[in-house]
Design a protein with these regions (language model features):
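Alpha-helix C-terminal capping segments
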Residues: 123-133, 147-159, 180-181, 278-288, ...
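Claisen-condensing/thiolase-fold acyl-transfer catalytic domains that form or cleave C-C bonds
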Residues: 268-276, 368-434
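Active-site/ligand-binding loops adjacent to catalytic centers
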Residues: 68-70, 200-238, 246, 258, ...
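Positively charged, low-complexity intrinsically disordered leader regions
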Residues: 3-133
């Protein structure tokens, strides 16, 4: 098909939207290792997980055999409010870079939450409501997940308690107020409201928090209240399952114009966006149908894939959550206060960790000043102000496009633009004022985190 016929934005029709989520674990030869009970170090049973998570979500978490799972009609109806999202051809960026590469990005910022997080938030809220629960608790880093969940809970009339990483709580007051507007209560983490929060504050006075800290508090808040369950915005298998709508739509849009990507790039914190984007393409690679280059991009200040260890570790700082086998910096690792709050997590999805360990994708770490250079370049050329998290993928997409400029290769690059950065102006202000710095943890600092890894036979 002629390139001239490829529009700036490729939209699917509503009747072309996915009716099933794709479960990449079903096609994996080496399955992700099971979650372990922190007390017994034995695989978690559905009954044990049911004390923390909603029943139907537990089934999804443990399902590594069914490749497709039906999306309930109520969730599909909600998706129609903001999906399908566009796959955008970055013609202006290509021209500015002078590259023969073809660049596409899947834009997930066209909803009030400002990011892809709503795809899983509405699913988890639906199952909580269906179970007859009063409410849910959660953590949030930059605030996108908390915003998405507050929207979903408002839709299903559920109570929503959010523990927000303290550095983001302070940097992003407007994100906090959006959550409150949708009815959520928002607490900076670590806090004095939970036992684990008080313990972390005593051990790390003045800490700016981390996703691991906030998870611990949210889990405690859920398990000590009748009629509540904990929900998570990343890392877990169930979240990657719900986020597969991103990759399924991307794949369908590309196929409409007979486009085959060479490189697929996503930012990586806990893995929700990356897993959602690459899963359907990874399935083809696993089945030997096609080959793609997958690149996970993480902050150099929190490099779980590029410098972490593949081991069982606690998913939270307070060590109350199940243990997951993943690439980790240690649950006690507290990353520097970088401006990509959604990527400040010590570990990585077990599913993505297994795929990475099997050599099926690669990872790169980038420093935040170079990330914001790419973010501003993208904003000025493509007209979208990207979230700091998304900008990690932009950085590497530009790098790959410039490589094509040097070699003359006409590669097709697809990356995930997870959301907008309109609530991240403190970060942009720091960059514009020349006050932004890069921080890369030393080997000695990482060793402290590794020393705390649990001993699992």
């Amino acid at each position: 098909m002629s390139e001239k016929k490829i529009p700036y934005k490729i939209y699917l029709e509503e009747n072309e939207m996915p009716t099933q989520w794709y479960n990449v674990r079903a096609d994996m030869k080496n399955k992700p290792a099971p979650l372990l009970n922190p007390a017994t170090l034995k695989p978690m049973t559905a009954e044990e997980l049911g004390h923390v998570f909603c029943d139907e979500l537990v089934k999804q978490e443990l399902d590594d055999t069914n490749p497709y799972i039906d999306i309930p009609q109520e969730i599909r109806d909600f998706y129609r409010m903001y999906r399908p999202s566009p796959l955008v051809r970055a013609y202006c960026l290509e021209k500015k870079l002078g590259t023969p590469a073809k660049i596409y990005y899947k834009f997930e910022g066209n909803n009030t939450s400002g990011s892809h997080k709503l795809n899983s938030a509405i699913a988890q809220a639906y199952y909580a409501k269906k179970q007859g629960l009063k409410g849910v608790t959660t953590e949030t880093g930059a605030g996108q997940w908390g915003t998405a969940l507050s929207m979903a809970c408002a839709y299903f009339d559920l109570d929503c308690k959010v523990y927000m990483v303290k550095v983001s709580y302070e940097q992003k007051p407007f994100r906090r107020e959006v959550m409150r507007t949708y009815g959520a209560s928002v607490t900076p983490s670590p806090s004095e409201t939970t036992e684990v929060g008080r313990k972390i504050l005593a051990e790390h006075p003045g800490t700016t928090g981390s996703l691991g800290c906030a998870i611990s508090e949210a889990v405690e808040a859920a398990t000590t209240r009748e009629g509540y369950r904990y929900v998570l915005g990343s890392v877990l298998n169930q979240v990657l399952l719900h986020q597969s709508v991103i990759g399924l739509e991307t794949k369908a849009a590309l196929e409409k114009y007979d486009i085959t990507p060479d490189i697929i790039i996503g930012c990586a914190g806990g893995g929700s966006n990356l897993g959602g984007l690459i899963s359907p393409f990874m399935g083809e690679k696993l089945c030997g149908e096609k080959d793609y280059q997958f690149i996970a991009v993480e902050p150099a200040s929190c490099p779980s894939l590029t410098r972490g260890r593949y081991a069982y570790d606690f998913c939270d700082t307070g060590r109350v959550c199940p243990l997951a086998k993943m690439y980790t910096l240690g649950s006690g690792f507290i990353p520097s206060a970088n401006h990509a709050g959604g990527l400040r997590y010590h570990g990585m999805s077990s599913t993505l960790s297994q795929l990475y360990d099997d050599g099926l994708m690669e990872a790169r770490s980038v420093e935040q000043t170079s990330v914001f250079e790419a973010a501003e370049q993208f904003a000025r050329i493509e007209g979208i102000l990207p979230a700091p998290e998304s900008s990690h993928a932009i950085r590497v997409a530009i790098d790959e496009a410039l490589k094509c400029k040097e070699t003359g290769e006409e590669k097709t690059i697809v990356f995930g633009l997870t959301g907008t950065g309109y609530f991240d102006m403190v970060a942009y202000e720091k960059f514009n004022n020349g006050e932004m710095t890069d921080y890369i943890p030393t080997d000695e600092e990482l060793a402290v985190g590794f020393a705390g890894l649990p001993k699992v036979e």
